[in-house]
A protein has these predicted regions:
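C-terminal catalytic/motor cores of large multi-domain enzyme assemblies
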Residues: 1-191
């Protein structure tokens, strides 16, 4: 509903389409700030903690391949800044105009198989990163809504998230808490 209400005005103001990816990227950036143990890479026997939160966004190319341009310092961008950055990188990727700095330095990756109407999948970690978030297709589903007056059934937009992570660094508790942070942020996001 939020996207439908705001997409035309957003396009007029920012010159880019309003998608869910900037909101998801914002949630991931906040989760990485809250759980810096996930914003690391593995170098041999060493774990390298990253100072910057640089989120890679998998972009499908016309030839069927994928490339992962990087939104540098994603935690310093607001929703508008994220939308413009993601749109710009995706266009550059599809026009084969990415520069080396556009694909370098990622500390975490998001892949959106929902673009292809897949509900969920198992993303492969973009090494040397230690985790990747997979985003599924958003569809309407019946859901139980808990209220003080009792439970009721309503139609809600649902999206599956999947997190793959390197168990040498991220255990189940950390991975579960990280994913819960993202899901909770998205479920309670006000726009």
């Amino acid at each position: 509903r939020w996207r439908e209400k705001n997409k035309d005005a957003f396009f007029r103001r920012e010159g880019v389409k309003l998608t869910y990816m900037p909101v998801i990227t914002e949630a991931v950036a906040k989760a990485l700030a809250a759980y810096p143990q996930v914003n690391v890479s593995v170098d041999g026997y060493n774990i390298l903690f990253k100072k910057h939160i640089n989120v890679g966004i998998a972009v499908s190319l016309n030839d069927g391949n994928l490339i992962v341009p990087v939104v540098h310092d994603a935690d310093h961008l607001n929703l508008n800044g994220l939308a413009v950055a993601i749109d710009s990188l995706a266009l550059k990727a599809r026009d084969n105009k990415l520069m080396p700095e556009d694909i370098d330095g990622g500390t975490f990756t998001i892949t959106n198989f929902g673009t292809f109407k897949s509900l969920f999948g198992t993303p492969i970690i973009n090494q040397p990163q230690v985790a990747i978030l997979g985003v599924g297709y958003i569809e309407k589903k019946p859901a139980v809504i808990e209220t003080p007056e009792g439970d009721t059934i309503a139609i809600r937009h649902k999206m599956y998230l999947s997190l793959s992570y390197d168990h040498r660094v991220v255990d189940g508790m950390l991975g579960g808490n990280f994913l819960h942070f993202i899901a909770d942020y998205l479920e309670n996001w006000q726009g």
